[in-house]
């Protein structure tokens, strides 16, 4: 049975980490996804903007993506209602085994989080996985299922644009992406306490897959800039989704795009819910550097790997200062 895992975290020791300083404002690119379905000139400009955002920032916000506000709010409500269930109900999904199809855990046990609880489960294809999902709250499967299907659609649009922008063509890997892994990670962060020195809810890390699409109820996500390692807070723009590059897109692009290091900080005003939808190929399908992006001037930079390889990597490296993509880099002679 495939595992419900997620990211490999950069920080191994969380005690004594100083509270983060407020990052300077540095607006993130905002992409109007509707331009992808307009005329060819509009699509070309949108493709250019998406790939540029991936190259320079590793992330962007998307608007006009076709997911209704009611669908997004419904998913956040379903997540919030799940975390409000009794401890006994939530513990039905608790497991130390990352190879479970659904898993609930808290920062007191998982050795990774600093202050959060989470529920992770698979979502694509929905008919294969929804039977593992919670039946409480009563509308969970309906609301989260609708949102999962919609984010899978958006991920396909984005991947087509990115692959086109890389010169690989919009249909590159299309069938494999359609049948690929999607897993949904629901995160619940408490309100920051004035007595608590450590304000970080989730340590710096990058995600495993091609793309992560994130919905957040309130600000708390921070992203690291490629050029200077500075942090920027990601606003919770009503109706917008946050998108960032994962480790396997860095591999596929042969290093043209870099996976985004990000973290979660506790909100001083309220508790926070986020829903991360992470997209990649199927469990055993290896991702390699695209041959079209490898030549004598651009040698292959990474080894191929699959999601199963990532799961094998996790147990021995969970608490080390290392990201998964770092283990895939080919040493230059």
From Swiss-Prot:
Cofactor annotation remark: Binds 1 Fe(2+) ion per subunit.
Catalytic reactions on record: melatonin + 2-oxoglutarate + O2 = 2-hydroxymelatonin + succinate + CO2
Family note: Belongs to the iron/ascorbate-dependent oxidoreductase family.
Thermal properties of activity per the entry: Optimum temperature is 30 degrees Celsius.
Occurrences of domain Fe2OG dioxygenase (ranges): 180-281
Expression tissues: Expressed in roots.
Identification of the protein by name: 2-oxoglutarate-dependent dioxygenase 21, chloroplastic
Cofactors required: Fe(2+); L-ascorbate
Enzyme class: oxidoreductase
Domain of life: Eukaryota
Molecular function per GO: dioxygenase activity; L-ascorbic acid binding; metal ion binding
């Amino acid at each position: 049975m495939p595992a419900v895992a997620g990211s490999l975290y950069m920080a191994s020791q969380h005690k004594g980490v100083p509270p983060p300083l407020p990052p300077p404002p540095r607006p993130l690119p905002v992409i109007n996804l509707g331009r992808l379905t307009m005329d060819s000139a509009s699509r070309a400009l949108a493709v250019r903007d998406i790939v540029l955002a991936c190259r320079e920032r590793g992330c962007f916000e998307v608007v006009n993506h076709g997911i209704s506000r009611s669908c997004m709010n419904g998913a956040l409500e379903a997540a919030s209602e799940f975390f409000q269930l009794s401890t006994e109900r939530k513990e039905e999904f608790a497991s130390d085994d990352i190879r479970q199809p659904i898993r609930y855990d808290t920062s007191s046990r998982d050795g990774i989080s600093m202050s959060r609880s989470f529920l992770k489960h698979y979502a694509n294809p929905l008919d294969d996985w929804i039977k593992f999902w919670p039946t409480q709250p009563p509308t969970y499967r309906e609301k989260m299922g609708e949102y999962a299907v919609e984010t899978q659609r958006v991920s396909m649009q984005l991947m087509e644009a990115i692959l086109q922008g890389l010169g690989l063509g919009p249909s590159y890997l299309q069938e494999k992406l359609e049948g690929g892994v999607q897993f949904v990670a629901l995160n619940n962060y408490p309100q920051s306490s004035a007595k608590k020195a450590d304000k970080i809810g989730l340590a710096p890390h990058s995600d495993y897959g091609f793309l992560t699409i994130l919905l957040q109820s309130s600000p708390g996500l921070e992203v690291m800039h490629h050029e200077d390692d500075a942090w920027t807070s990601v606003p919770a723009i009503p109706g917008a989704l946050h998108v960032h590059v994962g480790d396997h897109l860095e591999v596929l692009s042969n290093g043209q795009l870099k996976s985004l290091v990000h973290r979660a900080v506790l909100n001083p005003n309220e508790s926070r819910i986020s829903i991360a939808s992470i997209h990649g190929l199927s469990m055993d399908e290896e991702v390699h550097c695209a041959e079209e992006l490898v030549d004598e001037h651009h040698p292959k930079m990474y080894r191929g790997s699959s999601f199963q390889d990532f799961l094998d990597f996790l147990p021995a490296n969970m608490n080390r200062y290392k990201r998964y993509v770092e283990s895939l880099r080919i040493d230059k002679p």
